[in-house]
Amino acid sequence: MACSNWVFTRNFQGALPLLSFDERVQYAVWQHERGTHDHIQGVIQLKKKARFSTVKEIIGGNPHVEKMKGTIEEASAYVQKEETRVAGPWSYGDLLKRGSHRRKTMERYLEDPEEMQLKDPDTALRCNAKRLKEDFMKEKTKLQLRPWQKELHDLILTEPDDRTIIWVYGPDGGEGKSMFAKELIKYGWFYTAGGKTQDILYMYAQDPERNIAFDVPRCSSEMMNYQAMEMMKNRCFASTKYRSVDLCCNKNVHLVVFANVAYDPTKISEDRIVIINC
């Protein structure tokens, strides 16, 4: 099976072999050790996962290689131990710690977004979305709460249950529904304008313990997705888009619908709905 982090031992007699690596290697560290015989012991971290035979070819000299157990930091420290060291240690490249790849990708994007757009447009798109959201989250909005907003604010500070859907109804527009809904994003809420059920569930499944805000445009009022609302509020649903996953969550969340129309009692149980009029 392919892996990116490996440990290796290369036995030798006579002159110390010189190790050299190419662009496939992210990081390597090794030293000359002597126990019962001379050998090189080291770790190697590849930029992409590779199989056993490829790793041996990269190191050269028919080494013994094993998939790394534990963290790359622990393995790196172990192969640099002083007790059996004869010479070294030597290193190549930069250690990529767990969780640091995303930061490095973002750094590359910020350094030259146009270059990444040409080479990897999908990654550039995600990096730009992340940058824009971070800028949005930093922006502080001073809201003078209207009476309905104060009522909603107090309600979402209470403990959510597994049934109640809060329906904010304002038929005229301009009441501040969308402004309030977008502000909730800064407090970790999931924001959606609606759409197809599996599209909504796929996006929500990325972090399914978030509170939920449906900010429904007037033009979409006739296509209100009650199915998605109930599935998300019930805390058990299947997201079948791209990567199928069944999700069951113990944590209850608030679900708020901001709409220009009243709810349809033929499509959702009336006892679920708490109405706030704008």
Swiss-Prot record:
Active site: Y78 (for dna cleavage activity)
Binding positions for a divalent metal cation per the UniProt entry: E33, H39, E83
Entry GO MF terms: ATP binding; ATP hydrolysis activity; DNA binding; endonuclease activity; metal ion binding; nucleotidyltransferase activity; RNA binding; RNA helicase activity
Statement: the UniProt record of this protein carries the keyword Nucleotide-binding: yes
Domain CRESS-DNA virus Rep endonuclease: 1-95
Residue positions of motif RCR-2: 39-41
Cofactor binding description: Divalent metal cations, possibly Mg(2+) or Mn(2+).
Cofactor: Mg(2+); Mn(2+)
GO biological process, one term: DNA replication
GO-annotated cellular components: host cell nucleus
Ranges spanned by the short sequence motif RCR-3, renumbered to the chain: 78-81
Entry EC no(s): 2.7.7.-, 3.1.21.-, 3.6.1.-
InterPro entries linked: CRESS_DNA_REP, Helicase_SF3_ssDNA/RNA_vir
Motif Nuclear localization signal positions after renumbering to this chain: 48-69, 95-101
Record localization: Host nucleus
UniProtKB keywords: ATP-binding, Covalent protein-DNA linkage, DNA replication, DNA-binding, Endonuclease, Helicase, Host nucleus, Hydrolase, Metal-binding, Multifunctional enzyme, Nuclease, Nucleotide-binding, Nucleotidyltransferase, Transferase
Reactions listed under catalytic activity: ATP + H2O = ADP + phosphate + H(+)
Binding site for ATP: G176, K177, S178
Family, as annotated: Belongs to the nanoviridea/circoviridae replication-associated protein family.
Further comment: The genome of nanoviruses is composed of six to eight segments. In addition, some isolates contain subviral DNAs.
Domain notes per entry: There are 3 rolling circle replication (RCR) motifs. RCR-2 is probably involved in metal coordination. RCR-3 is required for phosphodiester bond cleavage for initiation of RCR.
Function: Initiates and terminates the replication only of its own subviral DNA molecule. The closed circular ssDNA genome is first converted to a superhelical dsDNA. Rep binds a specific hairpin at the genome origin of replication. Introduces an endonucleolytic nick within the intergenic region of the genome, thereby initiating the rolling circle replication (RCR). Following cleavage, binds covalently to the 5'-phosphate of DNA as a tyrosyl ester. The cleavage gives rise to a free 3'-OH that serves as a primer for the cellular DNA polymerase.
Name of the protein described by the UniProt record: Para-Rep C1
Lineage start: Viruses, Viruses incertae sedis, Alphasatellitidae, Nanoalphasatellitinae
